[in-house]
């Protein structure tokens, strides 16, 4: 399954906005998406699974535009 790896977050990016974006593309529940967003904001490396091969690139691009260091990884697809 393709993943998006998040390695850093620019200061001031809202965890709620990150969680909402992750939830929209992954189908995660809000609590799980918020946990991933909180870990990313705290500086941890976070990987999220995306079911759709094309959506993995869209999510990585969107998160990058929001100020995150995000990279698509389709190697597990």
Label each residue range with its predicted role.
Residues 1-77:
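Short, amphipathic alpha-helical interaction segments embedded in low-complexity terminal/linker regions
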